[in-house]
């Protein structure tokens, strides 16, 4: 009988031990990594930049929580050769609770301390964003392709959920590719995508949730052609880019948990 009792109790003890000591009992999520590329080309007017700033300050920043990462970088004509983040922060993660080692009151105090740190860092980032947006940047070209290659590097081995936000009109404008001068057609899109793929200019963004805010062009027809190109581009990159998240303003924010799932 004692042996039977021991056999009955042992699994229960093991389950209790796992529940109290396993991080999954009260583990924090891995968080979200939000990378923002901001268009500083001459085609972006001051009104558009002001809207970008509002979207960062009123939508993106408030959605960040403990454990999240934010990086903001420019889209300009020297993205690859002179890349430098404009703003970056990693918010401290919420502490995990273990029934074996943690006192409840002590744990709650640690959580409160982290929450205060997160609020302070977000306020600091808001000030930094305002400082960046207040400066006079103006690039002669818009090299979005290079920015997306940088995004691939930034997301490499990133354990957090990956979200890419492009604040741009999405008009590539470089000596090699000028979207306003292309005679757009379905065959032209496929030809350009094949050329970019052959030149290794389509990054690997598998599992990255993509948002575009600021998409525009001189005509509705051109805007639609460019949107169709980017739809094919991101599909080849492996990113999660839905047409509903490609717009003139930031829509459907914050990202749903299913955004990065293919």
Task: Enumerate the predicted regions with their spans.
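Extracytoplasmic/secreted cell-surface and envelope-processing proteins
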Residues: 44-48, 80-84, 173-177, 219-224, ...
